[in-house]
Amino acid sequence: MHNRIADCFARLRKKKRKGFIPYICAGDPTLKRTVDLAVALEKAGADLLELGLPFSDPLADGIVNQLAAQRALAAGTTVRGVFDCVREIRHQSQIPIVLYSYLNPIFQFGADKFHRAAEVAGVDGLLILDLPPEEDSLELDRLNRSSSTLSETKQDLVHIRLIAPTTPTDRIKKIAGGAKGFLYYVSREGVTGARDSIATSLPEKIAQLRKFSDLPIAVGFGISNPDQAREVAQHADAVVVGSAIVDLIAKHGDKPEMVEKVGAFAREIANAIGR
C-alpha cells in the first residue's frame, strides 16, 4: 500500500519546494462549498489539505475555528457527511487529505469503524488533537487493523503526530520514532489562531526535530499572512495556514465570491513559500 502524503512530499523534495497545507472546517458554510473550496485551494497551489471534522468542544482551537465548527454543526454536518464530502473531493482531486479531529466524534462513531470509513472515503491521514500519548499505540493498532481489511489498491491511512514547544526531548524521540507521513510542529503554545509574529525559537526547535526523524516537518498554529509563511518555509518542509482562511470564509459566507476570495489568498501564501 502507498500514501498520497508520502508521494506528495517526495515530489516536493524532488522539485526542492516547500509544501502549503491550508486548513478548512468541513461543512463551513456547507459541505458542497467545502468541496468547492478544496478544489479551489489545490488550483491556488495547495499541496495537502487539512480538513477539520467539526466538534462542539474543540479545546485546541481558537475562536475563529470554534465558530467555524459551530457553523458547520448548525448546518447539519455529520461524520458520515464529512466522509461523503471527501468522496466528492476525490471525484475531482487527488490532493492528500488529513482529517483534523478530536477523540470524541471518533469514539461516538465507533473507532474501528471510523478508521475504516475514513480510509475507504479517501482520507490519507488522521490528526487527533486530544489523543493522550499513552493511547498512541492503540490508535496505531486501529490504523493497522483498518488497513489490513482493505484491498491493496487502497491508500494507506497514517496517523500524523503533533509535537509542541513544550514536548520533552524523550517524548519527541518516542513520537518521532513511530511517526509516518510528516511531523506536525505546533509553532506556539496555546490554541489555533493568527499571531503577530513567529516564535524566535522556531529554527532551533525544527533543527532539534531533524535530529530524531527524517520525516518532513510541517509547522502550523498562528501563521496568518504571506510574510509569516515565507519565514516559516525557510526552516520547515511545509506551512499550515488555517485561521486566516477560515476567517475569510466567515466574512464572505455562502456566496460564490467566497471561494474566489479564499483562492486568491491561498495563491498569495503559495507564492510566498515558493510555489
Model-derived features: where do they sit?
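Glycine-rich phosphate-binding active-site loops on the catalytic face of alpha/beta enzymes
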Residues: 51-56, 125-127, 132, 185-193, ...
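Alpha/beta catalytic cores of nucleotide-metabolism and tRNA/nucleoside-modifying enzymes
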Residues: 207-215, 224-234, 238-275
